[in-house]
């Protein structure tokens, strides 16, 4: 157990308190006490080091030994073979608000993560030597993921600096990515999910940009010329708030929420109460304003008025968009609900002028799915979480972290929520709630104030999240199509996900990093022999067969 805060001056009383707080003495092992002025405070001092050298000579003190963190862990595991282990999520019952605070920062971080992947890949395929430039961009990017920056718990000048850095990084990556005559699929599986392709002459609008909705149908790691086909607009009907499409018959309320979502393909209803319902709560967690959300945040709900009832604002042969304008006393919220001719997804775009104080905005989805678990996407896999609230531990997990998607399924069918930069989500019985915006005042009184534009997609599906390929759909939702004239000569490595293709840090070798993201095992027979590497890109063997296990990360050299 480390000290309880980020500053420890190595006083004898702190050492004693640390030892007394260590409750597993009967299991053996040691406890670590890290000392120094933390949180940007410059670390340990000479006085602290001198105290450390004297502790071992005092009989009234616990036995102390000075060593580094790696040495401590190695020695502790070697000397104590029977140490108890924890399997599963270590859930911190605080700082839940950091999943949501500073929405624009988190959204831009997500976009840049995918742009780094694209820039590295295209540099390798073009034979360009951009590694040193990309490395410097990575360093600046990772500094802004540091404690208090990406979580949003920082003062306003930090936010301004971070967004300026992100703009600089994005411009440099865009220059590396460049352009071409054809659209290149950077994903190592067929790109078959509906996508928005910018086009100044397009008939649709998204994020304020004109373009077209189309199904690319581009094979893995291949290029293709895309042209929007023209279709008649008679693929849907809309009357008195009810829309019928090839996939759904949905009844919507004036505020954009659903009173019914009937699945024409699966012959079932999906809703059971408020579905796609925007709710704004009073959010006043006290001392740790930007950090925390309290369990009682639902006690007071803020009234939302409908300024413009839901109505069709745009439609073509692929997409129909319904628009409603909502407001509070201080903020304006435009919600655009999109249905598609060729996709089961229902996209919701939110254009928000946000000027609140101590507020939490959520989109809530009460479904009729019977389940006690939900799946949440992570950076290279997913984690399973309980949705019922029988115990105090379950009740404490009212807000959890996820990445690109979350899912609730029963046998045969379920619903996923796919996002482009939202990380906080709650589960309560059969209800999912996606956290959208916060309005904290400490340590930044202007936190999240201003303009926001973000989307999420509701994705009902047959089967479960794995069999419905939700992860592939979410990857396509987050990885924009790019124009590039390149050719791929390596295997596609399906069904593993191509996490990265990059130049080696220490040689001219090309490094391929793969991850298994569906919890399965198997093997891939390659048409060549490749080097098997560890995560540090050190060679550990050669192979022509990749044997993989659930959620394994594999690094190869070619």
Residues covered by each model-derived region:
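The substrate-binding groove and active-site-proximal loops of carbohydrate-active enzymes
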Residues: 2-13, 33-45, 155-156
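C-terminal (or distal) subdomains of carbohydrate-active enzymes
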Residues: 2-20, 58-60, 70, 81, ...
């Amino acid at each position: 157990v480390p000290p309880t805060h980020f500053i420890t001056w190595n006083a004898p009383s702190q050492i004693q308190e640390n030892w007394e707080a260590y409750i597993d003495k009967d299991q053996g092992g040691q406890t670590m006490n890290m000392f120094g002025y933390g949180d940007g405070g410059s670390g340990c001092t000479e006085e602290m080091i001198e105290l450390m050298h004297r502790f071992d000579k005092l009989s009234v003190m616990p036995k102390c030994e000075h060593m580094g963190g790696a040495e401590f862990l190695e020695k502790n595991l070697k000397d104590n073979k029977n140490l108890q282990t924890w399997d599963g999520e270590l859930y911190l019952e605080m700082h839940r608000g950091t999943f949501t605070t500073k929405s624009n920062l988190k959204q831009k971080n997500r976009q840049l993560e995918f742009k780094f992947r694209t820039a590295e890949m295209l540099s390798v395929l073009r034979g360009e030597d951009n590694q040193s430039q990309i490395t410097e961009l990575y360093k600046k990017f990772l500094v802004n993921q540091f404690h208090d920056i990406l979580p949003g718990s920082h003062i306003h000048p930090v936010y301004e600096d971070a967004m300026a850095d992100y703009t600089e990084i994005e411009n440099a990556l865009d220059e590396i990515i460049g352009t071409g005559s054809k659209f290149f699929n950077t994903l190592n599986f067929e790109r078959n999910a509906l996508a928005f392709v910018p086009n100044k002459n397009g008939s649709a609008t998204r994020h304020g940009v004109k373009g077209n909705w189309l199904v690319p149908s581009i094979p893995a790691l291949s290029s293709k010329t895309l042209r929007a086909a023209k279709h008649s607009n008679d693929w849907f009907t809309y009357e008195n708030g009810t829309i019928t499409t090839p996939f759904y018959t949905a009844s919507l309320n004036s505020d954009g929420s659903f009173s019914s979502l009937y699945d024409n393909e699966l012959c079932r209803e999906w809703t059971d109460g408020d579905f796609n319902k925007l709710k704004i709560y009073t959010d006043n967690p006290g001392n740790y304003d930007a950090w925390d959300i309290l369990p009682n945040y639902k006690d007071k709900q803020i009234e939302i008025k409908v300024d413009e009832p839901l109505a069709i604002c745009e439609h073509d042969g692929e997409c129909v968009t319904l628009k409603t304008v909502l407001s509070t006393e201080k903020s304006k919220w435009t919600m655009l609900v999109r249905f598609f001719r060729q996709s089961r997804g229902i996209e919701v775009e939110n254009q928000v002028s946000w000027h609140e104080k101590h507020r939490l905005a959520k989109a809530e989805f009460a479904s009729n799915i019977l389940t006690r678990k939900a799946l949440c996407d992570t950076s290279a896999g997913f984690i399973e979480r309980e949705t019922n609230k029988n115990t105090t531990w379950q009740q404490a997990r009212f807000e959890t972290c996820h990445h690109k998607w979350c899912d609730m399924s029963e046998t045969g069918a379920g619903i996923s929520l796919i996002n482009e930069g939202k990380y906080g989500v709650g589960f309560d019985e059969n209800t999912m709630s996606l956290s959208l915006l916060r309005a904290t005042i400490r340590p930044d009184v202007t936190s999240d104030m201003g303009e926001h534009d973000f989307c999420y997609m509701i994705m009902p599906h047959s089967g479960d999240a794995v069999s419905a390929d939700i992860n592939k759909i979410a990857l396509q939702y987050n990885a924009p199509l790019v124009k590039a004239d390149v050719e791929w000569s390596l295997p596609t490595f399906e069904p593993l996900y191509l996490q990265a293709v990059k130049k080696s840090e220490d040689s001219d070798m090309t490094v391929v990093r793969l991850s298994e993201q569906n919890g399965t095992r198997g093997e891939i027979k390659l048409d060549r022999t490749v080097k098997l590497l560890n995560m540090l890109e050190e060679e550990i063997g050669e192979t022509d067969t990749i044997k993989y296990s659930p959620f394994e990360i594999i690094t190869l050299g070619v």
